[in-house]
Amino acid sequence: MPAGGGVVIGPGPMTPAVRALVYTNVAVFFVSFIAAMSGNETIVAVLGLKPQLLFEQLYVWTPFTYLFVHDPTGFGHVLFNMLALWMFGVDLERRWGTRAFLRYYFVTGVGAGIITALLSLLPFAAMRSMYAVTTVGASGAIYGLLLGWAVLFPAPQILFMFI
């Protein structure tokens, strides 16, 4: 609630890094969506994180690029990732500054991708099935933002009103 006692809806205007991340994610989504509608899955196959390709064919860019690729068969994944990025990322970027925010975003996102790939090497049956599965989306980085936001802003109440 602002100092004047009014109601705040959302975190306010997007900050520079959040805006750039949202625009990039949405642009990549629409390109992959259009490609997928014409039967071309190359974008997801080349930019998504598939541990098998990472380890066997050295697709070393994928722990970074998977953050920008979302499921091209529907809008929900990218929509809610970008909503969370806006809701929580704006406050973090304002608090930390653009450079520190981007560093945190990519460390948590790339870190989540690397952990996912390493877990796929474990001998357990459920983990081994992850070896040939492609991971896409900014969810790892978004969970990192949620953690950072919860640590820095432990008391605020978040109201979800979709009607």
Regions found by a protein language model. Name each.
Residues 1-163:
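A detector for small-residue-rich transmembrane helices and their helix-helix packing motifs
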